[in-house]
């Protein structure tokens, strides 16, 4: 027994707590056979509540009026009973209410910046290769780049019971490689495509199994007979069939390379120090049509066709490519073009992406005219500036100012932007 009693969180759903039954026995049967039911638990709450109040001189019941995860902002039925019944019938009880408000000022979050100490710079230099995806990460958020490539914080790994986006894309790429690998160096004709389309339709299960076995991390997906993964399997079949039929309209063309690695070594003079960087890319498909070399990249994710298919009529667009992450496909296309042209100087080259979510539109070309040497040089000049910024010890890794960039970032909890 206490003279002064304070009870916190007297909200409906907390006091009494919401009842949930995990019993397989229906409520009516439990009630009939006098087994414990939710009403009994509520009665226990009521007993202990009023027993606590019985000999107290001053009782303070506190509840939260704000809605949240664990509260609907509604005061408990016990408070209503005290106000409307207990206080009304007992003249010795005086009940009154107070609404307390406070100006709460949340502490301002400090922006996170990572200085480029000698140790951090050494971590950057140990990064063997820089891909278009890696550099796009820096454009998106320098701090995210640091976490991923310098600090090498691993993203949370999950056991893949269902297809991840990565698994979907990797298996698609492997199937396309299997279908075209025997055609490298040959001119693909109408008849060959008709035969390929027919072969694919009749042997898809075998091709699927082969692709999953070649990608050893996806061996468990080789034999799918039911469930969501079977649906994904059928979606990939439809996508590949659409690609093959679209390729049929492009014949004749000659496949030069599939899933080939391309590299370019760059020497950067940063504050008088020479830093060697290797730029790397994996080209999905390189082909020749009408004496023009074409690099095609399959995209299983979402692509903004309005942005990616825009004609580049001025150099300002290349400037925006290095500032706007929404143009990352354009950045990747020019990045691949730069790698390829540095080892194939005489090629007339165009680059494009196969946006598989909008496959009906065919390939989106960066430009339908071959990339000029001036445009290539301008891109590489901007690329050098970006690389020097990454390795410049006077430029720290800072958070992006655009919160939208944090939406799918695996490290957003570190920055308190989740």
What are these language model-derived features?
Residues 1, 135-143, 160-171, 200-207, ...:
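Secondary-structure capping and boundary motifs in well-ordered enzyme cores
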Residues 1-89, 253, 300-301, 305-323:
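Conserved C-terminal motor-coupling region of P-loop helicases
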Residues 23-31, 142-153, 209-216, 293-313, ...:
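Active-site-adjacent bridging/hinge elements
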Residues 30-38, 60-62, 116-120, 124-134, ...:
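Glycine- and acidic
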Residues 67, 88-97, 104-105, 325-328, ...:
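Metal-dependent nuclease catalytic regions and adjoining charged, substrate-binding loops involved
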Residues 80-182, 402-403, 407, 411-412, ...:
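C-terminal, charged and often intrinsically disordered regions of DNA end-processing helicases
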Residues 174-267, 374:
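A non-catalytic, helix-rich entry segment at domain boundaries
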Residues 257-341:
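Non-catalytic protein-protein interaction segments used by genome-maintenance enzymes to assemble
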């Amino acid at each position: 027994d206490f003279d002064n009693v304070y009870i916190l969180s007297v909200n409906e759903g907390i006091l009494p707590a919401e009842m949930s039954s995990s019993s397989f026995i229906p409520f009516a049967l439990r009630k009939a056979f006098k087994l414990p039911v939710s009403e009994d638990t509520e009665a226990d709450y009521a007993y202990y509540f009023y027993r606590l109040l019985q000999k107290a001189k001053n009782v303070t019941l506190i509840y939260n009026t704000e809605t949240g995860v664990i509260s609907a902002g509604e005061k408990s039925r016990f408070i209503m009973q005290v106000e409307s019944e207990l206080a009304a019938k007992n003249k010795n009880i005086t009940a009154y209410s107070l609404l307390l408000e406070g100006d709460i000022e949340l502490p301002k979050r400090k922006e996170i910046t990572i200085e480029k100490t000698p140790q951090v710079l050494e971590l950057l230099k140990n990064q063997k290769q820089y891909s278009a995806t890696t550099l796009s990460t820096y454009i998106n958020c320098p701090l995210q780049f640091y976490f991923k490539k310098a600090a090498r914080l691993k993203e949370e790994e999950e056991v893949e019971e269902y297809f991840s986006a990565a698994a979907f894309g990797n298996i698609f790429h492997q199937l396309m490689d299997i279908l075209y690998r025997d055609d490298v160096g040959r001119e693909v004709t109408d008849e060959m495509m008709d035969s390929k389309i027919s072969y694919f339709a009749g042997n898809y299960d075998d091709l699927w199994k082969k692709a999953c076995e070649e990608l050893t991390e996806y061996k468990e997906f080789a034999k799918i007979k039911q469930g969501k993964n079977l649906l994904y399997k059928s979606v990939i079949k439809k996508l590949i069939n659409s690609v093959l039929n679209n390729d049929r309209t492009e014949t004749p063309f000659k496949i030069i390379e599939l899933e080939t690695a391309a590299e370019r070594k760059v020497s950067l003079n940063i504050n008088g120090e020479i830093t060697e960087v290797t730029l790397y890319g994996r080209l999905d498909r390189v082909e020749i049509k009408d004496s023009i070399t074409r690099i095609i990249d399959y995209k299983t994710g979402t692509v903004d066709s309005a942005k990616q298919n825009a004609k580049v009529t001025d150099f300002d667009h290349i400037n925006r490519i290095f500032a706007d992450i929404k143009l990352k496909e354009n950045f990747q296309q020019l990045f691949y073009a730069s790698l390829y042209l540095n080892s194939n100087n005489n090629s007339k080259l165009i680059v494009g992406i196969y946006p598989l979510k909008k496959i009906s539109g065919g390939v989106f070309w960066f430009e339908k005219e071959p990339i000029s040497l001036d445009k290539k040089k301008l891109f590489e000049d901007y690329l050098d500036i970006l690389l020097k910024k990454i390795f410049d010890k006077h430029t720290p890794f800072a958070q992006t100012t655009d919160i939208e960039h944090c939406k799918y970032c695996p490290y957003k909890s570190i920055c308190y932007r989740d």
